[in-house]
Every structure is written in structure tokens, then in C-alpha cells.
């Protein structure tokens, strides 16, 4: 404790107490903090806290560093345990002799058993592997995966897993994480990478949101515009036109109480007609995960209320 406080005080020194100069030299060889102007030795027990090795590029830095990966909630033991590589090579990259490979195989097997020692850990390990699979298939970034893993762990602590499938709860946690981090994914998209029905995922999500007191804001139609337009290979002009239509619709209260994906799909469909990049209702509906009837209904409301002159 005393050493940490002393280290902190040394690190906070910015000026020479003798002449006031900011030209301070850290002499790690002699363990001294010296003023470059007047030569005063400010501290004579200065310790280099960095590594003792040198690296000349990022590859060398990574290979020589001995610290492990950062802690992560997406692994059941938070990444704090040791793994034995499946490559039959030692730490120097040399091949393991054939006579030692059977022993190494047994070590790997026991290490795997020890890492997951009880039913609760097996459940968590299985769930987080499933989460990783879903997130990978949906191209969901790491920060969202971390959030989803934390939500799932909270659900386990609240005993919300009992009577529900692991896959369903994981899907609900992933959808909740997407909503919290403003990375829009529809229930249909989540359901497309699971064996759980969309209705069940939605129900699990609502239960989680209520009991875990998740702070989730309602999703907005404009959150989906960029991704839907990208899937439909529409230009930036069409995207901007769709966003303009949505802003006008919000100003007159057309979006309240309606599904954001349906409104976004209709705005994109209208924008594609206006800019001449025509897309069929079926194509837009498939990307947005809504029905053609929904697009037609929202299309009619938007064109009539906003007085848009659109030729189908």
C-alpha cells in the first residue's frame, strides 16, 4: 500500500522542485529521476515498471508479452483459466516427441474436465458457446456479446433458466443486448440463427427486461435504415431520402404505436420509388422481416399523410 502511494507520488511529479523546469529525465539504469536543466536528483529509487524485454514491432511485442488475454464474460471462467494447445508443439515452436504425445493428450483431457467441474458451469459453458455462435452468424460486435453474456449470467443468478431452454434464454439475452447497445437486430434475425420461435424469444426478452430491470429504450425506425438499405444495395441518396421521410413522419406522429421495422421498410420502399432505384415490396419485406401487407399499410399511411407523389 505504502509502495503504491509512493509510486503514485513519483509519477505525479511534473516539475523540478529546485528550478521549476519540466525537463525531467527518467534514468532507469540508475533508478533516478533527474532534472535536465539544473541536474538535481529529484528521486533516487525510481523503478521502471515496464517489461524487461524489447520489441521492435507489434508481432514481437505480442509474442514476448507474458500477460494473458483480458477478462471476458463471454467465457464461462471469464478467461482466467489455462488452456493446453491442441498443437503438438512446445513454447519454442518445436514438435513434441511422439513418445510424449499420449501423456499430453491425457493432460488436455483432464484439463478440459477440470475447467467445467459441475452442472452449473457446464450450463454456463454451453450457453456462452451458443451465444458466440449466434453472434458470429449475425456479425454482432464484441461489446454486444459481452453485454449479452452479462445479462445471461444475471438471469442464471435470478433462477430464470429453470423451465426454459438454454437457447431461448441466450437468444433473449442477445436481443436485449442489441437493444441496449443500439445495434439493431430484429427478433426475426435472432430467430433465424436459433431453433427457437420468434414468439418465444420475444416472451423471454420481455420477462428478462422486467425482472432484471434492464434499461432499454424503444427502438426507432431510423436505426434500421442503414442496414436494410445496405442489404438491398441501395445508394446513399435513397438512404437519405428514407431518413427524410421518417423524420417527416415522426413530426406528424405517424410512427408512434407502430412497429419500427414496418415503418422503416415502408420508408425505404417509398424512397426507392422516388429515387428510381425500385425494389419490390417482397424484396423489402424479406430484408426487414415483415409482411408485404404491413408495407402496403404503412405505405398508404405515409403517402397520404405526408402527401407524397409516388408512382408505383
UniProtKB/Swiss-Prot annotation:
InterPro entries: Cyclin-like_dom, Cyclin-like_sf, TFIIB, TFIIB_arc, TFIIB_CS, TFIIB_cyclin, Znf_TFIIB. A zinc finger (TFIIB-type) spans 12-43. Coiled coil: none annotated. PROSITE patterns: TFIIB, ZF_TFIIB. GO terms for biological process: transcription preinitiation complex assembly. Sequence repeats lie at residues 129-212, 223-304. One of its GO terms (cellular component) is transcription preinitiation complex. Zn(2+) binds at residues 16, 19, 35, 38. GO terms for molecular function: DNA-binding transcription factor activity; TBP-class protein binding; zinc ion binding. Keywords: Metal-binding, Repeat, Transcription, Transcription regulation, Zinc, Zinc-finger. The keyword Transmembrane helix does not apply. Belongs to the TFIIB family. NCBIfam families: PRK00423.1. Stabilizes TBP binding to an archaeal box-A promoter. Also responsible for recruiting RNA polymerase II to the pre-initiation complex (DNA-TBP-TFIIB). HAMAP family: TF2B_arch. This is Transcription initiation factor IIB 1.
